[in-house]
Amino acid sequence: MSEAMDQPAGGPGNPRPGEGDDGSMEPGTCQELLHRLRELEAENSALAQANENQRETYERCLDEVANHVVQALLNQKDLREECIKLKKRVFDLERQNQMLSALFQQKLQLTTGSLPQIPLTPLQPPSEPPASPSLSSTEGPAAPLPLGHCAGQREVCWEQQLRPGGPGPPAAPPPALDALSPFLRKKAQILEVLRALEETDPLLLCSPATPWRPPGQGPGSPEPINGELCGPPQPEPSPWAPCLLLGPGNLGGLLHWERLLGGLGGEEDTGRPWGPSRGPPQAQGTSSGPNCAPGSSSSSSSDEAGDPNEAPSPDTLLGALARRQLNLGQLLEDTESYLQAFLAGAAGPLNGDHPGPGQSSSPDQAPPQLSKSKGLPKSAWGGGTPEAHRPGFGATSEGQGPLPFLSMFMGAGDAPLGSRPGHPHSSSQVKSKLQIGPPSPGEAQGPLLPSPARGLKFLKLPPTSEKSPSPGGPQLSPQLPRNSRIPCRNSGSDGSPSPLLARRGLGGGELSPEGAQGLPTSPSPCYTTPDSTQLRPPQSALSTTLSPGPVVSPCYENILDLSRSTFRGPSPEPPPSPLQVPTYPQLTLEVPQAPEVLRSPGVPPSPCLPESYPYGSPQEKSLDKAGSESPHPGRRTPGNSSKKPSQGSGRRPGDPGSTPLRDRLAALGKLKTGPEGALGSEKNGVPARPGTEKTRGPGKSGESAGDMVPSIHRPLEQLEAKGGIRGAVALGTNSLKQQEPGLMGDPGARVYSSHSMGARVDLEPVSPRSCLTKVELAKSRLAGALCPQVPRTPAKVPTSAPSLGKPNKSPHSSPTKLPSKSPTKVVPRPGAPLVTKESPKPDKGKGPPWADCGSTTAQSTPLVPGPTDPSQGPEGLAPHSAIEEKVMKGIEENVLRLQGQERAPGAEVKHRNTSSIASWFGLKKSKLPALNRRTEATKNKEGAGGGSPLRREVKMEARKLEAESLNISKLMAKAEDLRRALEEEKAYLSSRARPRPGGPAPGPNTGLGQVQGQLAGMYQGADTFMQQLLNRVDGKELPSKSWREPKPEYGDFQPVSSDPKSPWPACGPRNGLVGPLQGCGKPPGKPSSEPGRREEMPSEDSLAEPVPTSHFTACGSLTRTLDSGIGTFPPPDHGSSGTPSKNLPKTKPPRLDPPPGVPPARPPPLTKVPRRAHTLEREVPGIEELLVSGRHPSMPAFPALLPAAPGHRGHETCPDDPCEDPGPTPPVQLAKNWTFPNTRAAGSSSDPLMCPPRQLEGLPRTPMALPVDRKRSQEPSRPSPTPQGPPFGGSRTPSTSDMAEEGRVASGGPPGLETSESLSDSLYDSLSSCGSQG
């Protein structure tokens, strides 16, 4: 308008001057100009108005978008919290169910004499149904009726499935489930699983599996099976398999099948029809068995032995039970021999059996089974596949007697079931399983079902082939057991069979037969990622026994468990275990542990248990491995793969996922080690592992789902391992198996030791897993996925939260440790939340979690290299399957995230949600907590390993982007500045305070006062610390170099660290653990990480750096808490080990280097240098002081670290008792550094708990002195530094003390209390600190 005005003015002016010339024109021109002016003004005003309107609209849109985003984030957060609550509830329920089942099973075992009778009754009824075996539907209905006794719902399902003709209905029901919304379907599956568990408990109590097996194993059974193998009887075996599955997993399995299949029943029905005479009875038996253990037992007996066998079944059952329990070890050995023999001669059959003519039944079965797997169980069941398998099992049974029977029961029945339920139900069951962690795999399974079915068939068919090829029971018998054995190992191989295998693994002898079947099938499905996922989810589902499809698998697991239980005693427990595990992996783990203990009572089964473990563990691993590997790996694994499966198992804990996974993995590791060591079923245990490992690597995507499944299995197995070989087996199984069967004994000790610590046990196993598990390394990379096993463990925290999550975390900080914890103590539920918290972090970035996993794997690998803690290493490895770890990591991270939120729902959550960095002040992120969280999750993904710190930074950056888009950028910048200022201030204060603790031991540092004497020297470096803080704040100077230097060591140490993380979660997280590592690596790294990660890293640095890396990862939350104490947001990934490199871009380079070793955790500290600065300073003085202290002369130099590492590593690697020497090297450095810083930090908050332990130097290894504990525990080499060890511990604890300042006190206490609790507390504290900082 001004222009227009000017123009008019100018116009008139011009005309005016020229008025004289153009007087006449002036009026017209002026009017014209005025008119134009008005027009321009009107136009301008209109444009201005339009502009304003547009601006308002735009702003409104922005506001709406921002609101929507925030709302969505908040809703997501709420949903997460709700999911966590539900998971917890499920976990509690599952644990209750499992405990009840275990008790019931124990009672049943006590009344074993009556057991055969019970099965007898069912046997006869199944017998009658067999009378009308021709009528598949008739038989189906009959079966449903028995089922109906115990489970009306099942009856309905069975009837539906059976009546439809099996194939159609089964397929239809899964679609129906599919049709349901995933949420509803999950709910339905969960309800089904819960009901199944309820029903299963009684069935399990009946522990018909044992009787069934004996009858099946009875001489009659093999013949009928063989005879049937050739003809209609073959179908019988198939139905028998369901029965068998139901027998051991009995109700759980049946329910799962039925449930999963609303049409699994169809499958099962088909199965029954398969063996018209025997199949129906078996189906019925299954029906009955699940519902009525006796029915199941008799059914299996009847099916397997046929009517003729039916009569002897009872006697055979009782005899077999007694024999099995007494001779389970021998049977397993025999099975092993068979497997070996068949491996040599039947390897081909296994791989090519299904195709081979010998497999005529098998091929027949294969197509049918494929069909079945695809969703037409009837054709599959009807086909000879199940029968073939059964015959094979029957042969096994014949050859080996009760064990073969078990094998047949487990293998034949289970394998087919696993195959068809796994696949047909896979979708449903997998979904169920997925409910817990890998829904997507489950879903994929539905589509992949055909493939997986085929894979399963292949896996199973080969076993079937083997079985059918040797219609003359003997060959089949050996082959079946062998298959079973391999499958056990391969259990992990195939998702669907895998669950079966897992169950079989639990079942021991059964494991092997099924393993044979499952193996071929497992590997095939696992090979294909989809298949792998599918199969794995089935396994998960099986474990869950929620999903219809996987139900079979769970059934298998249950059966295996039952079988194991039968062998071991609490067969009922296993089924719940699978159920619980699937429902809540952690729960399963936890429950399984208790059940395992219960099972443990059944020592006769104990031999079976150990072998079962190997099977279960291998199975778990096989799941992972087989998926990757193929039938071959599974088959191969029997002998050679045995170690690999172990690794797979070790890796497993890393699996997502699920924390329970971790827990399970830990359990698996334990189981494996236990079984292997106890039974010397190294082959069995080991074979599966190779498969698992392979599977893990190849089927990462499957692994994610599969990991969870294995985890689930593992928990079951772990339970058993824990029960029977609770100490050695539980912990050592996985890792030991992986590293060396010999370690089993050590793991046993370790397990017990850990068990004493509670979470520690698992932690250690997890740690070993971490170390050994490549997956773990991978998980490290996958940061969120599994590396934050500890964090992710939290996802499964309920069950294996502490153990699973943390062990996972080992590399990732949380997952490894948690798994360890959970297995160690079912208690870790408090810890579980911790795990959950941690889990969520890793979970945040599931993709990254995978990356984290990778990172963890890398770290793990170093850990493996540093088998200082062989047990730990192997175990860590076993639990952390690459995929499993990833999956577990993701899940656990998610859970962790959710739990973290739950834990510090108020400010903590908010702070955490609000950008980890900027909003930990509670400043900028309060608006978008969900967004922040999501960013964090993204960050986690980005820095899977470094996760937290990196995640924070990434998150911050992402959030900043979002904020900018949402006009929050300014707020974010302010928050960042504030955060930095706070960090610096806190760093200063912390450094001063920590030094103070050294001297005066002020307030928070009062605890440090305990370590004052030791800290005094360290605190001499207080100035140095301050300087370092300043340096870090200013520029994160030297850390990069030093960091890297230590990192290589850490790389060496990292694996250990990873493990240690798990072991030291309490300590490491407490700032103390990381301290040592940090001391050496952190000072250099801190500066670099200082800016971005400073706040995150400081704590991670100080907390997670040293051993803590693994340890820290295990207790990433603690680390964060510690950091947060310093002013670091809890989220810096404790999974630093894995994620640290990713944690902070700045520190990333250094961190990346560090990830190889504990340093990964350390890198986060670098990132958080500002916050950590004080810690770093502490650390630096600590390093100098440590050197001065003489903790280890080498401590000062990073290279020295290596020399010092031996001793320090031992300290640092406390978790890795065996690996003390290797692990300690990096830890030494860490320890040195940490001694100083941690002493301060720990002194304050952790000191009370840690200090004494530290001073104890003892390996109290109690959860109490997490860092110290670890170190003390590590203790042999620790002893000399013990004095310093305590300071060391103190050092680490000091880090904690930082956290303590912010509420880490609880954490500090928890370290002593429980690894899991420590983790939880530290996580919580870290969140709180975040809030307080804000």
Curated annotation (Swiss-Prot):
Region (Mediates interaction with beta-tubulin and is required for microtubule bundle formation): 750-1146
Region (Disordered): 1-28, 115-146, 210-234, 266-316, 349-711, 782-884, 931-953, 986-1015, 1030-1183, 1197-1334
Motif extent ((S/T)X(I/L)P motif 2): 816-819
Keyword field: Coiled coil, Cytoplasm, Cytoskeleton, Microtubule, Phosphoprotein
GO CC, alphabetical: centrosome; cytoplasm; microtubule plus-end
Basic and acidic residues biased stretches: 933-942, 1033-1050
Main subcellular localisation: cytoplasm
Chain intervals with Polar residues compositional bias: 358-372, 519-547, 638-649, 1110-1122, 1235-1247
Modifications made to the protein after synthesis: CDK1/Cyclin B-dependent phosphorylation mediates its dissociation from centrosomes during mitosis.
Subcellular location: Cytoplasm, Cytoskeleton, Microtubule organizing center, Centrosome
Coiled coil: 28-106, 956-994
InterPro entries on file: NCKAP5_C, Nckap5l
In-chain residues carrying the UniProt-annotated modification Phosphoserine: S440, S451, S470, S477, S493, S496, S498, S571, S577, S767, S1194
Binding partners and assembly: Homodimer. Interacts with CDK5RAP2. Interacts with MAPRE1. Interacts with beta-tubulin.
Protein name per the record: Nck-associated protein 5-like
The organism of origin for this protein: Homo sapiens (Human)
Gene symbol of the encoding locus: NCKAP5L
